[in-house]
């Protein structure tokens, strides 16, 4: 990996550590719910409540195609699909997150509604007008070229579609110094 964001977030053996944590709680990690996973996959400000509120305000509905850019291991994507019946594609720069998200999703019965793809938000690997909704939660802060990011999000959003963003927007215009509060290694 040569990208500092991918290097920071790409921790090895993440799935094994998640499985071990569930085993220590006496929980079968092969059969989970989105609520079970929330402590490990909803690490953005506001957690599941913020995701639900964003979805309500954004009027997410059944059978829409949603692109979750920087969606990590897929917590919000699984929640959206579970609660609203939409299909969600998670795009993340970090290969380990994509691998773990793809492994966890069948465990909550959503493998046909949530998919994962490794890729760069500044070069979205999708045709124009592919998604009803483009969605981000605390991922744009990791992307310095905001104008290009927003052009790419707009490009893949269908005419009349929605861009739904939950981001921290204010602060000094300096490079990000890891770890940011929601990405502390534990």
What are these regions (language model features)?
Residues 1-24:
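N-terminal auxiliary segments of SAM/dcSAM-dependent transferases
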Residues 27-30, 44-62:
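Conserved alpha-helix/loop element of class I SAM-dependent methyltransferases that forms part
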Residues 35-45:
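Class I SAM-dependent methyltransferase Rossmann-like catalytic core
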Residues 65-123:
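Class I SAM-dependent methyltransferase SAM/SAH-binding core
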Residues 122-133:
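A short acidic, Gly/Pro-enriched loop at the edge of an enzyme's catalytic core
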Residues 132-145:
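A short SAM/SAH-binding and catalytic strip from SAM-dependent methyltransferases
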Residues 147-162:
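A short glycine-rich, Lys/Arg-flanked "PGG" loop and its adjoining helix->strand segment in the class I
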Residues 168-186:
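Short, glycine-/aromatic-enriched active-site segment of Class I SAM-dependent methyltransferases
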């Amino acid at each position: 990996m040569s990208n500092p964001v991918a290097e920071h977030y790409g921790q090895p053996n993440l799935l094994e550590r998640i499985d071990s944590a569930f085993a220590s709680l006496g929980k079968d990690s092969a059969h989970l719910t989105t609520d079970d996973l929330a402590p490990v996959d909803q690490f953005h400000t506001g957690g599941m409540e913020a995701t639900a509120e964003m979805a309500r305000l954004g009027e997410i509905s059944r059978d829409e195609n949603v692109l979750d850019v920087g969606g990590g291991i897929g917590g919000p994507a699984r929640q959206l699909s579970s609660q609203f019946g939409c299909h969600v594609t998670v795009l993340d720069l970090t290969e380990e997150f994509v691998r773990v998200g793809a492994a966890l999703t069948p465990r909550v019965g959503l493998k046909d509604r949530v998919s994962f793809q490794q890729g760069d938000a500044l070069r979205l690997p999708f045709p124009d007008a592919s998604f009803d909704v483009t969605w981000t939660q605390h991922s744009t802060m990791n992307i310095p070229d905001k104008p290009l990011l927003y052009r790419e999000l707009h490009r893949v959003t269908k005419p009349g579609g929605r861009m739904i963003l939950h981001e921290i927007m204010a602060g000094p215009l300096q490079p990000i110094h890891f770890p940011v509060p929601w990405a502390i290694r534990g």
